[in-house]
């Protein structure tokens, strides 16, 4: 047989339909049923056996069904026996304290047990044991859960009633609301910052009326307006725009646009302003005005671009056609005449040379080109103008280790050493300018109709030539020409080389005749790089027809060319200009007798002895009779 479980009654197992053994007894939270005695168990067994043998099973079953449908309420009998059931037959048992149960108790127990047995028999016969057991178990579990819930509620009510937790929560809410009120009343300015806004969002809002909140918001807006006006009026180093709410003031925008004393703090202002613009609907975008302000500040810091006028460009172009690499003196004079700085003039020539080198037209340029049009040689004008210039004032200008060694060669400066076609021997840098060259030599263009470019840096008239043998050293010290051991230095050029900046011609016309410059010469000073003391006057040597002495003039090896060799013409059509001179120095190498201390040069009446450096011209003539002197770089050969 299977187990038979009922509410509030002991559970028995039937063995061979005769013996019943007690197994378990569930407990209820309110009552504790007592254990049935041995007499009760035996009486129940006898009753079940007699009931099964009788024919009155049906009436008993009907009676049990009626009893099952009734709900019994907890009652207490005379012996204080607890009986409680819901939907089942009441169960009663005698108290464990009573040692001898009475007849009434025995009869009640017997009747209850018989009814229970009939009910169990009914379940067995209807083959619903499993279903009944499951239902009964479910009902009991539900009842237990309900009881536990009720107990928990009772305990919670007891705890909340006894402890002040509820009042504590109320107190916290009131404290939070009071704190919010304090912040609103005493920390108005801090409410505009991010921290105040975050605190406001994190704190629970006090439960107040909507009208009160509306009035407080209106007051806050007015105070924000006033605070914004104060900040805008008294801010001199900039303003940190607060992260305002949706109702931000419009006066803040107008003041930000019109205020010129505000210096924004870069990205911080932009980010805060962008955040405000993203959250506010009636606010104008401040990022554009801020960008304009930053742009104006950057533009003010930038240096103005200085442009050359068309007149300045025309003069610069004209000079560039004649001399592409002017010396420092020419640049200074040009700057004074044109109203420019010498640094700008130098940079213009550098840019022009770079443009021509890249393949531009020779001597042509865009009139709209400004000083900084080229990207190659651009140098800032604020630098020291003379910082990049190196002037050699030592008085010794030696090319190729200072020795011009020529073996059986004819030509200017004792050969082709200084006028070699290779540009490596020439000074092509504008930063290494020797001031021994007179500015007139580089700027005078006597024949204005001449179309062929001539050598403008050095004006060489070959009255005499330098004959230097294998050990000839050209040294010029204090304007004394010492011929020691086959040292022979001939220093004759036109007197235009002694013309210094003391009588500089105007740059508007570059055509001068030689007599105009000679009329101004009384005792010409020496170039600054040749004579250490400029106040020292040169001595006139007798027996010479020239107005200026040869000792006051620089020697040929001390003159460095400032123009590139590729622009030196190689035509010999200008050699006819030497026909105006009565004396032509023809150097015949076959007739040069080189003794220990004697140099004999056949120059049509010009005798060069050991310690005498002279050039004798047979015919005395005035320089005014000569034709206007041209610039020549051609080499006179035999």
From Swiss-Prot:
PROSITE patterns: HOMEOBOX_1, HOMEOBOX_2
Signal peptide stretch: none
InterPro entries for this protein: HD, Homeobox_CS, Homeobox_DNA-bind_prot, Homeodomain-like_sf
Molecular functions (GO terms): DNA-binding transcription factor activity, RNA polymerase II-specific; RNA polymerase II cis-regulatory region sequence-specific DNA binding
Composition bias type Low complexity, residue spans: 24-55, 80-139, 388-411, 419-430, 462-501, 575-625
Subcellular location: Nucleus
GO biological process, alphabetically ordered: cell differentiation; regulation of transcription by RNA polymerase II
Keyword Transcription in annotation: yes
Residue intervals passing through the bilayer: none
Region (Disordered): 23-55, 76-139, 195-219, 381-431, 448-638
SUPFAM superfamilies for the chain: Homeodomain-like
Keywords: Developmental protein, DNA-binding, Homeobox, Nucleus, Transcription, Transcription regulation
Record's function text: Putative transcription factor.
Protein known as: Homeobox protein 10
Name of the gene this protein is made from: hbx10
């Amino acid at each position: 047989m299977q187990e038979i479980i009922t509410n509030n009654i002991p559970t028995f197992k039937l063995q061979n339909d005769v013996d019943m053994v007690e197994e378990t007894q569930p407990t209820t939270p309110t009552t504790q049923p007592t254990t049935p005695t041995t007499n009760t168990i035996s009486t129940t067994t006898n009753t079940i056996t007699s009931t099964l043998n009788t024919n009155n099973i049906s009436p008993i079953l009907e009676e049990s069904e009626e009893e099952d449908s009734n709900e019994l309420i907890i009652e207490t009998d005379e012996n204080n026996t607890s009986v409680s059931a819901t939907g089942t037959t009441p169960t009663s048992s005698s108290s464990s304290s009573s040692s001898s149960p009475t007849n009434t108790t025995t009869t009640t127990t017997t009747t209850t047990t018989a009814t229970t047995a009939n009910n169990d028999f009914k379940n067995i016969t209807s083959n619903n044991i499993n279903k009944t057991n499951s239902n009964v178990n479910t009902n009991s579990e539900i009842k237990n859960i309900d009881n536990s819930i009720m107990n928990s509620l009772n305990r919670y009510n007891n705890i909340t009633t006894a402890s002040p937790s509820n009042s504590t929560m109320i107190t916290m809410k009131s404290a939070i609301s009071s704190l919010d009120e304090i912040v609103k009343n005493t920390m108005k300015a801090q409410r505009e910052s991010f921290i105040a806004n975050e605190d406001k969002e994190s704190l629970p809002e006090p439960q107040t009326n909507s009208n009160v909140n509306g009035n407080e918001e209106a007051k806050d807006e007015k105070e924000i307006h006033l605070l914004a006006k104060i900040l805008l009026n008294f801010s001199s180093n900039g303003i940190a725009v607060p992260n305002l709410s949706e109702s931000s003031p419009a006066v803040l925008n107008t003041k930000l646009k019109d205020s010129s004393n505000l210096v924004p703090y870069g990205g911080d202002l932009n980010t805060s302003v962008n955040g405000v613009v993203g959250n506010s609907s009636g606010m104008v975008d401040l990022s554009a005005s801020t960008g304009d302000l930053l742009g104006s500040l950057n533009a003010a810091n930038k240096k103005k671009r200085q442009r050359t006028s068309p007149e300045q460009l025309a003069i610069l172009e004209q000079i560039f056609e004649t001399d592409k690499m002017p010396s420092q003196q020419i640049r200074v004079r040009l700057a004074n005449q044109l109203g420019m700085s010498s640094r700008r003039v130098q940079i213009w020539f550098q840019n022009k040379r770079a443009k021509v080198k890249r393949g531009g037209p020779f001597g042509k340029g865009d009139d709209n080109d400004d000083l900084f049009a080229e990207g190659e040689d651009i140098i800032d004008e604020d630098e020291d103008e003379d910082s990049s210039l190196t002037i050699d004032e030592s008085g010794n200008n030696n090319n190729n280790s200072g020795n011009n060694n020529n073996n059986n060669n004819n030509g200017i400066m004792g050969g082709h050493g200084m006028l070699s076609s290779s540009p490596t021997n020439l000074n092509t840098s504008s930063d290494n300018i020797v001031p021994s060259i007179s500015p007139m030599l580089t700027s005078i263009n006597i024949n204005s109709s001449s179309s062929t470019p001539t050598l403008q840096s050095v004006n060489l008239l070959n009255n005499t030539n330098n004959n230097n043998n294998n050990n000839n050293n050209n040294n010029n010290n204090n304007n004394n020409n010492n011929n020691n051991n086959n040292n022979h230095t001939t220093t004759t050029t036109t007197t235009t080389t002694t013309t210094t900046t003391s009588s500089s011609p105007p740059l508007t016309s570059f055509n001068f005749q030689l007599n105009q410059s000679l009329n101004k010469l009384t005792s010409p000073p020496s170039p600054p790089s040749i004579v250490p003391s400029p106040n020292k006057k040169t001595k006139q040597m007798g027996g010479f027809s020239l107005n200026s002495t040869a000792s006051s003039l620089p020697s040929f090896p001390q003159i460095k060319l400032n123009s590139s060799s590729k622009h030196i013409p190689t035509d010999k059509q200008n050699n006819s200009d030497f026909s105006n001179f009565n004396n032509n120095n023809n150097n015949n190498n076959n007739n040069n007798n080189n003794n220990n201390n004697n140099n004999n040069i056949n120059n049509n009446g010009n005798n060069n002895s050991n310690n005498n450096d002279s050039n004798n011209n047979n015919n005395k003539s005035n320089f005014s009779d000569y034709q206007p002197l041209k610039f020549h770089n051609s080499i006179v050969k035999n």
